[in-house]
Amino acid sequence: MAAAPTQIEAELYYLIARFLQSGPCNKSAQVLVQELEEHQLIPRRLDWEGKEHRRSFEDLVAANAHIPPDYLLKICERIGPLLDKEIPQSVPGVQTLLGVGRQSLLRDAKDCKSTLWNGSAFAALHRGRPPELPVNYVKPPNVVNITSARQLTGCSRFGHIFPSSAYQHIKMHKRILGHLSSVYCVAFDRSGRRIFTGSDDCLVKIWATDDGRLLATLRGHSAEISDMAVNYENTLIAAGSCDKVVRVWCLRTCAPVAVLQGHSASITSIQFCPSTKGTNRYLTSTGADGTICFWQWHVKTMKFRDRPVKFTERSRPGVQISCSSFSSGGMFITTGSTDHVIRIYYLGSEVPEKIAELESHTDKVVAVQFCNNGDSLRFVSGSRDGTARIWQYQQQEWKSIVLDMATKMTGNNLPSGEDKITKLKVTMVAWDRYDTTVITAVNNFLLKVWNSITGQLLHTLSGHDDEVFVLEAHPFDQRIILSAGHDGNIFIWDLDRGTKIRNYFNMIEGQGHGAVFDCKFSPDGNHFACTDSHGHLLLFGFGCSKYYEKIPDQMFFHTDYRPLIRDANNYVLDEQTQQAPHLMPPPFLVDVDGNPHPTKFQRLVPGRENCKDEQLIPQLGYVANGDGEVVEQVIGQQTNDQDESILDGIIRELQREQDLRLINEGDVPHLPVNRAYSVNGALRSPNMDISSSPNIRLRRHSSQIEGVRQMHNNAPRSQMATERDLMAWSRRVVVNELNNGVSRVQEECRTAKGDIEISLYTVEKKKKPSYTTQRNDYEPSCGRSLRRTQRKRQHTYQTRSNIEHNSQASCQNSGVQEDSDSSSEEDETVGTSDASVEDPVVEWQSESSSSDSSSEYSDWTADAGINLQPPKRQTRQTTRKICSSSDEENLKSLEERQKKPKQTRKKKGGLVSIAGEPNEEWFAPQWILDTIPRRSPFVPQMGDELIYFRQGHEAYVRAVRKSKIYSVNLQKQPWNKMDLREQEFVKIVGIKYEVGPPTLCCLKLAFLDPISGKMTGESFSIKYHDMPDVIDFLVLHQFYNEAKERNWQIGDRFRSIIDDAWWFGTVESQQPFQPEYPDSSFQCYSVHWDNNEREKMSPWDMEPIPEGTAFPDEVGAGVPVSQEELTALLYKPQEGEWGAHSRDEECERVIQGINHLLSLDFASPFAVPVDLSAYPLYCTVVAYPTDLNTIRRRLENRFYRRISALMWEVRYIEHNARTFNEPDSPIVKAAKIVTDVLLRFIGDQSCTDILDTYNKIKAEERNSTDAEEDTEIVDLDSDGPGTSSGRKVKCRGRRQSLKCNPDAWKKQCKELLSLIYEREDSEPFRQPADLLSYPGHQEQEGESSESVVPERQQDSSLSEDYQDVIDTPVDFSTVKETLEAGNYGSPLEFYKDVRQIFNNSKAYTSNKKSRIYSMMLRLSALFESHIKNIISEYKSAIQSQKRRRPRYRKRLRSSSSSLSSSGAPSPKGKQKQMKLQPKNDQNTSVSHARTSSPFSSPVSDAAEGLSLYLLDDEPDGPFSSSSFGGYSRSGNSHDPGKAKSFRNRVLPVKQDHSLDGPLTNGDGREPRTGIKRKLLSASEEDENMGGEDKEKKETKEKSHLSTSESGELGSSLSSESTCGSDSDSESTSRTDQDYVDGDHDYSKFIQTRPKRKLRKQHGNGKRNWKTRGTGGRGRWGRWGRWSRGGRGRGGRGRGSRGRGGGGTRGRGRGRGGRGASRGATRAKRARIADDEFDTMFSGRFSRLPRIKTRNQGRRTVLYNDDSDNDNFVSTEDPLNLGTSRSGRVRKMTEKARVSHLMGWNY
């Protein structure tokens, strides 16, 4: 008898028997039951006495009736998932009971421990190859082991020696703006040395991969570039365009090779065939006309046949071939079409032939891709039916494996919201390098990785936030694939692990993110290039970005957008020069605004590398435009002298004579005979009406002048090549051919692949066909097409060629733009000095990391040679404008960094000692006060060229932290903010000293090019002080070069100065101080001193021992240093550093000048250092004390290394006086005079009498006494020194008057509006919208909606009326008339209306990539950049006016018990919490009648996020002026007499209050209803009331307010009830610094605790505005729909501008009834209601943070941060989009809800 089983065993036997009984093994179950009873293996039962009894199997079943027969199976199914939670298996989702290792159900943590190999295991070989790592080998193997194994075996696995984690080191080298429109195409040449970009601006550009230089521009296309291809021989590039033409250029010379015209619609794809059969090759192109063309060309002669082999594949009208792909051997090409059919063509025979049509897909085929290797005939196709198919040719047919995008990973949950897409569509497909996996991109933003053999889903990759249209496999690493999409994200993925390695977000400052449209890897895999929607080229790669630092961020050739003329064969010539574009001489490099780059950048242009400086400055003369005005002269360097030299005139005259002679001789047949010349002799084109092709609009930044495009009007003789130039230029090589060996190997490889393909095809064709075909059908659906197909669909309104004629006038007028802020700022800066264009002042500000204005005094003298005019102090405004927003953040962070150490250090001790004298630790250290020049410690001077050693700086920081001298933020050190090498060549461009203890020296260091010595444009800041036992980490470049030339060897004897004595030693060895910096010279020598000590030394601290040197008497002792030796070791001035004279001559001249200056009484206070016993606090305020005597002693000792260092210290005399004393005190004025006199004397090297200079300055001051009243004093708290001329800024009088004039904003707004009108982007928004052009109206009229506004109709909301989407239509013509009528009360009202135009644009257009949306964004950026200055100056004027008010007004305000409208802050601790309860009376839904737009909803920046307008499909005509902008309504579209009422809506937002919070009724209390009604009715009589009477009236009204409501904040209804009240203007003058660039955040406030929500209250009053008439159309008619109580909807009538409001008359259709409008009453009421909105406006801003979204152009909540909604929203469902005009609630998508609740993640 067997042993009694345990309870578990008995139960297991029972479960097994039950399981067998329920299955097919019933006999086995019976046998098992018998054996269980026989061996008594059935568990026994117990009775109530505890006795055991045997029982049968049936009894056991009855006792366990709750156990089903499959209970054992369920237990086994549950074990695996439960175990996975504790110890995951190696292959997720695999359920097995028989696994081993990590798949075993008996696994534990010990069994799953990761394996580690020793070094010898890597050296093993398995079948001649290194073994694969085990699955549980977690981290990558050690590179040392792999390298050692490779040395032993001679081979290694690529995955071992280069782990996928290495791709984390890829970084963006440069982002270059090179196009004016979206760039959809990018490609590398076959060598990887060149990059090609094709853009919607019709240009193809060639770039250098290694350094990012722009090498050439290929012109000729007249529409968007849709695709590009480079042939395999690397000799040709072909580009297809929406102009139906394929152009082919020679890569070597950029000469056009062929213009292929065989399509009748846009080109959709273009490819060179890889086939190598014979000398005839093929170029294929597919088009939107449903055709594919095979263009034959000869590989040797590069001649193309005119007629292609063409296949027209149009199964029905409208079919397009959207994509194509060649097999790797070139024998097959497959195409995908919009008719759901895949077609395959065979090129193995004499002519191409179609061999198959595959119709398995049920929707458009958007992507096809052949596999990369020729060992199988496979390709993948992706369709909008939600599937991809892997096709393979087998047994005479193409069989497919279906990849269903709805498939999910087992045990993997999708991210929330990703599976909400109702219909999945494939957007892109790709293979990995070795064809083991297929990657598909889906419209739910996921990437899916599939096994290419079985079709199994391997990984789901999530991370993108928008659709992905770019999938690019690594050229040789099968693990790596790159993806990019419209969300601006670029990801590098590891396909083996299904993980993200690296990602980059393409955020463009001030413009949101840029959608990435194309990416390509270089052939060697070291780089990849991307292009985006904003015209940028992004270069990524491994290694250092040093070479990319030499190029500017914006690179255009000035000839890029010149007009072209075309011959009958569509070849082009430059219109101005009559030359082929590739034969024109080297162009000039300009930025996006058309401004030439400095000469150092001009040498980047091929052909200009060796030009002299004067040859690099473009001299483009005056050219008359279409209006008879002159184009602004574009030169490389603006000077005050505009008179051209006589030589220039002579040269131009000779050029003109030569042109005429050549014409007469007939040598230049294409030279235009009718060329005219202007007065100055510059070339004038007689045919200026021909617009540029392409006609491009600039979209860049705020100062959008037509810069690059205006350059085409300037074509002087200097840009017309001579015969010799043409010969030299034709010999240039832009793109090299492949090396013969490389080319031969590649061709052999392609030949072999082609042979294999033919062989496979032949074999499979002979096999017996199979009759079982795998095929799945899916429901058809319509959705988004592939990128290129989509672009073709948008072409009707995106292309600029369709509107070319319409934009000619604005093109001609663009040349006279002079309103650019950047230009004016540059003039103000450069005008102060005739320095070179490498202006360190601008560079300091463009990368500001110091808050001190002393940084603005840089070494211009060193760059300018003999030019000694000192740089003037710039105004604060100039500095702020030059800096970007990110720079300002760095500025603030550095200010905090500088303040914190000060506070920390000051805690060490008191300011003054017990004896009353200053504490010694506050004294300036000796190394700063020293007047004798020394090599060490290093004392910085302006203009010093240094070698910065990172190791030494790190050692200094460690010493400071160890000694706790002051707090140091490691994160803000330069090596943590940028990539620094071990040693950098830098230049001091800014110096500032911080008060101690200890006194710190802050330096601004600009990078210098090691070769040219010019500044690269980047810089960083450091702060340090001299510390004992800490070696200098800044070494003068001169000393460094001398030390490097000595080349110390082991055993060499040297000497070194330590404590003013020579010490001797021997070089023992040379090795890097730290292994991680192997190339650094810092302390790289190990030396043995004669006193037997050993130490690390730097070569510049070691001096050779000259012959005849006296050695010490005792070995190891020192020898005193003589004065001659010290002098010989000092810095030797370079040529030009002291002007035209030598240092000795200049020093003696200035010493004599100082001596004479000290004879004057006003200079005596500055003769000697300040007496610290008399002024003990002086050293706690002034960090760098100096005086005339100190300067004189330093001059005597030749302390200064250059004249700019001397001038910098002279400025500190005035700076210190200004810092310590009152600004207007006599001592400061005296210091100003001393500084001015001395600086002018130093600057004029011919002057020897300083008293004469003093008399001249005094005379100038007397003459300019009146003018000084109009100058503005710059910030007196700045820490930097400056001259008096630095305080007085030229042309400040006008700006000061503007700041003091509260009405100056009106003129400024008119100028801004004129500027907007000059932009072509404003054209769609100038006039009201024509409802005939919008779908909702067409449906009502029964018209066809197919031909109008195609974009909106692709939307699901086709039935939505324009009026349902746009509650508040407005256009620029309305704004302009309102502004001219004087109906705006403040610039904020003007701002609201213009913002409403942009909000409407966002709300209506559904396609964020549409051209109209881009136009709106550019126009909005332009507007925001100008309006913030207008509002800022308006605020200043209002506050200035308040300061001049009588005192009794202040008493009135001060008597208020709560926060007054004056904005004066309450005492801390006494500020009261106030609640805002705006009451909605009859006029609440009316905004201001001043805008003639009584709309109800508040102006909001956060509308629904979609653009407003679309262009009509008018290819040859201009814009329809009625198709954009506002809104007009047909009076016949509705039944007359049916007046429609609308509800008022108030935003349910919480209100925050601040010290400078929203406006109140004078005393901070909310008016009662009676008071409010009184204010409304009394607004009219205020119009004729004088200012004094109004003040009295206001006081009287205030006295009636109830004191019981003092705790509440009024609704600001009295803000404009009287003209004498300043509350309205105060509402717009919160804080000037709250303006930010980007999303227009103009109303930030100090946030406090929010109170309660606003309550929606409806008024019952009737409106007074009515229109009259019955017919016609006009602008005001569109406002009629907001009228209540009218007697009809239709009709001709006079609008609110007609009467009473002082405005113009408007005639149009409206819904309002008959009757005259009461303009004045409405205007006043509207102002009051608008002020109520102002309170809400500011309240929302105080509540909301600044929110950025990546869903630009989508209808989502919180697109901008100006408001939440513009409709009343139910509190039960706050996440919706408000209600439409018809009352329908606009629901938010689930994704938008998640985004709103969770916030946007970057």
Swiss-Prot record:
Matching SUPFAM superfamilies: Bromodomain, WD40 repeat-like
Biased composition (Basic and acidic residues): 889-898, 1587-1600, 1627-1643
WD repeat feature ranges: 170-209, 213-251, 255-297, 307-347, 353-393, 400-452, 456-495, 502-542
Biased composition (Polar residues): 796-817, 1479-1499
Residue span, Bromo domain: 1138-1245, 1300-1430
Biased composition (Basic residues): 785-795, 899-909, 1441-1453, 1649-1666, 1684-1697
Modified residues (Phosphoserine): S693, S703, S885, S886, S1577, S1579, S1763
PANTHER family (UniProt xref): BROMODOMAIN AND WD REPEAT-CONTAINING PROTEIN 3, WD REPEAT DOMAIN 9
Protein name from the UniProt record: Bromodomain and WD repeat-containing protein 3
Source species of the chain: Homo sapiens
